[in-house]
């Protein structure tokens, strides 16, 4: 059975660890330097992304979760860039700025998709006062349901045992992405997520599945761990828990471009899923699906709920369900090439009712494929006012995707879907209500491309607003 995505807006996660800024310079290489036998890169584009523990926080935020991050930085420009980028993503930053250290920064120079060199600007944080982080943890722990300790061996987790005990005393599970071969320092953690090389550095070479399981359980006992998740690259993942059978997950990656940040994605999706109420095995299945997405991207990357839903339930390959705009455009082209008539409609669909279902069934009967474009939460709020939507974008899309009449569900953030419709160009655009075809957003573009626009009637007596008022009034 495929796992169901939880409501990540309920997931509060505290991240403590080594924060860093990843910088990228891109450009073509057309000649060799006369000064040394190295290529000359003409830098045409630059990019800055939060990395390390900060990338974990970004992953939590991209899922719609509430991320609170504690880390060590310098008092410098990269620290400001890092804080501004995270804050813009609604990550709560609680950095300890130390004057004698630089903020860890990694600069990568790339040309034609290939990394030519990486330059590191860093000094390991040493002999820091544990209380600087412990006091911040104490304030944050009552607001979260999971803690991630993200260790890149840069010094932020110098006092990691104290951090583990602080979280455990508060009754909050601790998930750790380990670094190095000294797992004694992680004693008592709820879950460790070593990759295969990190695992073998501690237990020795593993020659079989049985040996992996035996050595994994021995590790759990030795270091008093709650569970162990070994990420195994092309062999997927193996989850080991006390008193339970091993849980193996095959890899879901189709193409691997870059493994940078994949471990961050695994632990962030896993912890956020547990914080949102998922059992550990389901959370691991979701993390495995997310890893399959992120290794297909270049550089440190995040996974959105749309991409995660696609990976879990299918869209590009299975050709149905929640889908991204780019994937939808591709799917529509393929469908139209097969001679299928594609119908498209849009709306908020905040509380799905009988009128919506009747309308969508009617729309589906007019063609071979039905697309439903859904206003995002911010778009609904602008259109409907405070208190709306009642249901989040992900929930509304999940319900629509479950209807037999609907083939694809795609979000849009603007007030109208005109841009999206112009990009998709369905054969038939339909809209419910009292409209003139020429006044429907996207209608002119569809007609200009040879398509049609049609207005359908809504079922009388069905209204989301009336349902909300009835609930407020206590009527059934």
Swiss-Prot record:
One of its GO terms (biological process) is ADP-L-glycero-beta-D-manno-heptose biosynthetic process. It is an enzyme of class 2 (transferase). Residues 1-318 are annotated as: Ribokinase. GO terms for cellular component: cytosol. Its EC number is 2.7.1.167, 2.7.7.70. It catalyses: D-glycero-beta-D-manno-heptose 7-phosphate + ATP = D-glycero-beta-D-manno-heptose 1,7-bisphosphate + ADP + H(+); D-glycero-beta-D-manno-heptose 1-phosphate + ATP + H(+) = ADP-D-glycero-beta-D-manno-heptose + diphosphate. ATP binds at residues 195-198. Residues 344-476 are annotated as: Cytidylyltransferase. Pfam families: CTP_transf_like (PF01467), PfkB (PF00294). One of its GO terms (molecular function) is phosphotransferase activity, alcohol group as acceptor. In the N-terminal section; belongs to the carbohydrate kinase PfkB family. In the C-terminal section; belongs to the cytidylyltransferase family. This is Bifunctional protein HldE. The lineage of its organism: Bacteria, Pseudomonadati, Pseudomonadota, Gammaproteobacteria, Vibrionales.
């Amino acid at each position: 059975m495929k796992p169901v995505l939880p409501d990540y807006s309920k997931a509060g996660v505290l991240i403590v660890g080594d924060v860093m800024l990843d910088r990228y310079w891109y450009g073509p290489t057309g000649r060799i330097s006369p000064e040394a036998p190295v290529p000359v890169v003409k830098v045409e584009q630059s990019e800055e992304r939060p990395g390390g523990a900060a990338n974990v926080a970004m992953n939590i935020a991209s899922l719609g979760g509430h991320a609170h991050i504690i880390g060590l930085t310098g008092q410098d420009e990269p620290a400001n860039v890092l804080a501004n980028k995270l804050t813009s993503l609604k990550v709560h930053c609680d950095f300890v700025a130390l004057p004698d250290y630089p903020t860890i920064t990694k600069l990568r120079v790339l040309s034609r998709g290939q990394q030519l060199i990486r330059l590191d600007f860093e000094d390991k944080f040493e002999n820091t006062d544990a209380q600087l982080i412990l006091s911040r943890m104490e304030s944050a722990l009552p607001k979260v349901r999971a803690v991630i300790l993200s260790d890149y061996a840069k010094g932020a987790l110098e006092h990691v045992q104290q951090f583990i005990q602080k979280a455990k005393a508060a009754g909050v599970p601790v998930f750790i992405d380990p670094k190095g071969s000294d797992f004694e320092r992680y004693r008592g953690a709820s879950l460790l997520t070593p990759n295969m090389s990190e695992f073998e550095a501690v237990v020795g070479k593993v020659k079989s599945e049985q040996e992996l399981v035996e050595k994994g359980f021995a590790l759990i006992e030795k270091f008093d761990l709650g569970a162990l998740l070994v990420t195994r690259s092309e062999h997927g993942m193996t989850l080991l828990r006390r008193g339970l059978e091993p849980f193996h997950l095959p890899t879901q990656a189709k193409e691997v471009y870059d493994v940078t940040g994949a471990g961050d994605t695994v632990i962030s999706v896993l912890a956020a899923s547990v914080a949102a109420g998922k059992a550990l095995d389901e959370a691991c299945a979701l993390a495995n699906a997310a890893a399959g997405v992120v290794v297909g991207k270049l550089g440190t990357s995040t996974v959105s709920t749309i991409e995660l839903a696609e990976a879990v339930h299918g869209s590009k390959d299975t050709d149905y369900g929640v889908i991204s705009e780019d994937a939808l455009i591709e799917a529509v082209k393929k469908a139209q090439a097969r001679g299928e008539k594609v119908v498209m409609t849009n709306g908020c669909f905040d509380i799905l009712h009988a009128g919506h279902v009747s309308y969508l069934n009617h729309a589906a009967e007019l063609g071979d494929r039905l697309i439903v474009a859904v206003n995002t939460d911010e778009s609904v709020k602008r259109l409907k006012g405070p208190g709306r939507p009642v249901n989040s974008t992900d929930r509304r899309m999940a319900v629509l995707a479950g209807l037999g009449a609907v083939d694809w569900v795609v979000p849009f953030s603007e007030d109208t879907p005109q841009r999206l419709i112009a990009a998709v160009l369905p054969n038939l655009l339909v809209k419910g209500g009292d409209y003139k075809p020429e006044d429907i957003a996207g209608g002119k573009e569809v007609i200009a491309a040879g398509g049609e626009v049609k207005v359908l009637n809504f079922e009388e007596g069905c209204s989301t607003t009336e349902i909300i008022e009835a609930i407020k009034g206590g009527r059934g």
